[in-house]
Amino acid sequence: MAITVGINGFGRIGRLVLRVALSRADIKVVAINDPFIAPEYAAYMFKYDSTHKAYKGEVSASGNKINIDGKEITVFQERDPVNIPWGKAGVDYVIESTGVFTTLEGAQKHIDAGAKKVVITAPSKDAPMFVVGVNEEKYTSDLNIVSNASCTTNCLAPLAKVVNDTFGIESGLMTTVHSMTATQKTVDGPSHKDWRGGRTASGNIIPSSTGAAKAVGKVIPELNGKLTGLAFRVPTVDVSVVDLTVNLKKETTYEEIKSVIKAASEGKLKGVLGYTEDAVVSSDFLGDERSSIFDASAGIQLTPSFVKLISWYDNEYGYSTRVVDLLQHVAKA
């Protein structure tokens, strides 16, 4: 029986989640809600993508629906989720991808509107967070609202888990060199809470805060309080990279670390954690479905217990793939 899905928020993640969902035989997206996007424009935005290129199938719009390869999807334009007729549309699961309704209280509106469960595509202050490949097995069916954490946490957590499980992490600092996102400015503009964040995205390297490293402690409790980090926003359109510098409890060699991560990428974490020794750059990972691709030739070691590890991620497509994976896991529980 198909998993019937509604998507709230048809931005970067919402549209890519739809692309991924359309490739899964057990998922049927029946409705989209976005108060700022009419059906005809939704069809256009889905079909044409400057980063991931045009959708190869047939896309059209008629009335309040869009049609993708013969599959009809109803488009709603409600500002308040409680007014979205999810129940009438037959939606059981909602992907909350507006970046607005990220708390239990906010996401509950979807359930009040007729949905059964909600997956939030952002970190949450109070909803339980799950990272596929790290802690999704802890999900229980009584949890109706869950968070897929952030794209950066999805990159960092699998790597941190493998390293911690084998060598133990005493403490660590993370830097993510992160591509531009929609919240940034095309030219200098007002940004009262984050002055640097108001500067031109395409012409600056912008230091920023991130809770991604601390969030790892929520999905890997034994690392709680042991990791923190920061971000640099850089003028690339997609694909980011994590720099994880850690003090290890157990002394080792960089070759042994590489071997352990490679084994994990070919075993339980295959499809989530990747491994490469090639001389790669960011654009080589556009469209990569994996959460984290360890760059074996980019890391360095200073002492037997102090190392810097580098891992790439498509912060749009890889993350959207994990959203759909988590949705499937929730539906099967």
From Swiss-Prot:
GO terms (BP aspect): glucose metabolic process; glycolytic process
Keyword Cytoplasm part of the UniProt annotation: yes
Ligand binding (D-glyceraldehyde 3-phosphate): 150-152, 181, 210-211, 233
Subcellular localization: Cytoplasm
Keyword NAD in annotation: yes
PROSITE patterns: GAPDH (PS00071)
Residue numbers binding NAD(+): 12-13, 34, 79, 315
Family designation: Belongs to the glyceraldehyde-3-phosphate dehydrogenase family.
Protein name: Glyceraldehyde-3-phosphate dehydrogenase
UniProt organism field: Komagataella pastoris (Yeast)
Source taxonomy: Eukaryota, Fungi, Dikarya, Ascomycota, Saccharomycotina
Gene: GPD
